[in-house]
From Swiss-Prot:
Keywords: Amino-acid biosynthesis, Aromatic amino acid biosynthesis, Cytoplasm, Transferase. Transmembrane segments: none annotated. GO terms for biological process: amino acid biosynthetic process; aromatic amino acid family biosynthetic process; chorismate biosynthetic process. This is 3-phosphoshikimate 1-carboxyvinyltransferase. Belongs to the EPSP synthase family. It catalyses: 3-phosphoshikimate + phosphoenolpyruvate = 5-O-(1-carboxyvinyl)-3-phosphoshikimate + phosphate. Monomer. HAMAP family: EPSP_synth. 3-phosphoshikimate binds at K24, S25, R29, S164, S165, Q166, E308, H335. It is found in: Cytoplasm. The active site is at E308 (proton acceptor).
Length: 422
């Protein structure tokens, strides 16, 4: 039976400090590197959510030893990679795209499957690349099977990563363990979400791996050891954006502690986005503080590199003082759901005026009314519905539990934030 969550309306300007759990992107990259490292690693402040638990469970199945440490940390000791093993990807793009290269280093049969929607998501780029590098794989999408020999030759490979930067990151993360390393060349439309590849490169270098990304659309990773990690995981900045948006739309003030001064996280772009919409944005020792304006300004913005922020920005644009254009996000049609079609459908269902373009959305603010907001098993669609519900009474968000994909207790955090209003 479908469950609908009554999105709470704000009774005034939100004023709150909202600690946000660790970054999913950093946590899942760190787990892969730790499983392939030359010694035991410690991850402090990792995200504990469905996506990261799926990654941890899969790495255990492949041979890594992951134990709970003090204060929510993870202790990871690498072990011989071997099958037979079964990997449940759920709906986690990082699991379905980062772990096939790891499994190619294992000895034995590894099978991959996931949620029904995951079977529709593109995987052929990474699977064909692995075949070209010497892997034995049956299938081009979930479910598929990989027969490993305990090693992979590696070498040079050309892929089309225009559907997802995760195709590149997945190959790079395991490449130090390939006999020849890897040289990945992208051909096709521009790679989306480049900050995620920058994050992968930074984390590899921090682990002592030699990476050359000096040439556009070409990445070379040399073979060699991966140093053990001793890592404090940053807060998840993309997951922080709905809470900062709450300040923006209610004219309130929200602080997210621990916001890094420098980061490769795509979510850091929310600072510029909110400032362009008229909010006051301050980064200081207490974290990032956003104070909403009297009126939100519309914006024309290319979100190609930060497409994951599109649902949050679309919700903000629905309350702006004029028409907004969100560009550069055609690749969102292949995410957890077709996010462009979903945003148009759901905003229109509440009375909005939304038009799809070739690569984005045109949003003309209109008076909105309550109604059902379908999440399509997409965590960012669900949080966008919560933002709208702050100012639109009667918004009912379908399956708010889907937010557990990346936030362990979004409803509780949202309610706590709304407990502090003027």
């Amino acid at each position: 039976m479908t469950q609908f969550w009554p999105a709470p309306a704000a009774s005034g300007a939100v004023r709150a400090t909202v600690p946000v759990p660790g970054s999913k992107s950093i946590t899942n990259r760190a787990l892969v590197l730790a499983a392939l490292a030359e010694g035991p690693s410690t991850l402090r402040g990792p995200l504990r959510s469905r996506d990261t638990e799926l990654m941890a469970t899969a790495l255990r199945a492949l041979g890594a030893d992951l134990q709970d440490g003090p204060e929510g940390s993870w202790q990871v000791a690498p072990g011989p990679l071997r099958g037979p093993a079964e990997v449940d990807c759920g709906l986690a793009g990082t699991v379905m795209r980062f772990l096939p290269p790891v499994a190619a280093l294992a000895e034995g049969r590894i099978t991959f499957d996931g949620d029904p929607r995951a079977r529709e998501r593109p995987l052929d780029a990474v699977l064909n690349a692995l075949r070209a590098l010497g892997a034995d794989i049956s299938g081009d999408s979930l479910p598929f099977e990989l027969q490993g020999t305990g090693k992979l030759a590696g070498g040079a490979v050309t892929i089309d990563a225009s559907a997802s930067s995760q195709f590149v990151s997945g190959l790079l993360l395991s490449a130090p363990r390939f006999e020849q390393g890897v040289t990945v060349t992208h051909t096709g439309e521009p790679v989306p979400s480049l900050p995620h590849i920058d994050m992968t490169v930074s984390m590899l270098r921090a682990a002592g791996v030699e990476v050359d990304d000096s040439k556009r659309d070409v990445w070379h990773v040399a073979p060699g050891p991966i140093r053990a990690l001793d890592l404090d995981v940053e807060p998840d900045l993309s997951n922080a954006t709905p809470f900062l948006a709450a300040a923006a739309v209610t004219g309130g003030t929200v602080t997210v502690p621990g916001w890094p001064e420098r980061t490769d996280q795509a979510g850091d772009a929310i600072r510029d986005i909110l400032a362009r919409m008229g909010a006051t944005v301050e980064l200081g020792p207490d974290g990032l503080t956003v104070t909403g304006p009297a009126e939100l300004a519309p914006l024309d913005i290319d979100l190609h590199d930060v497409g994951e922020l599109t649902p949050t920005v679309a919700a903000l644009a629905a309350f702006a003082s004029g028409r907004s254009r969100l560009r550069g996000v055609a690749h969102l049609r292949g995410h957890e759901t077709d996010r462009l079609a979903a945003l148009q459908r759901e905003l229109s269902g509440l009375g909005g005026d939304v038009e799809q373009t070739d690569d984005g959305l045109l949003i003309e603010p209109r008076p909105l009314t309550g109604g059902n907001w379908h999440s399509y098993a997409d965590h960012r669609m669900a949080t966008a519905g919560a933002i709208l519900g702050l100012l639109v009474p009667g918004v009912l968000v379908e399956d708010i539990a889907t937010t557990r994909k990346t936030i362990p207790d979004f409803p509780g955090m949202w309610s706590s934030m709304l407990g502090a209003v003027d």
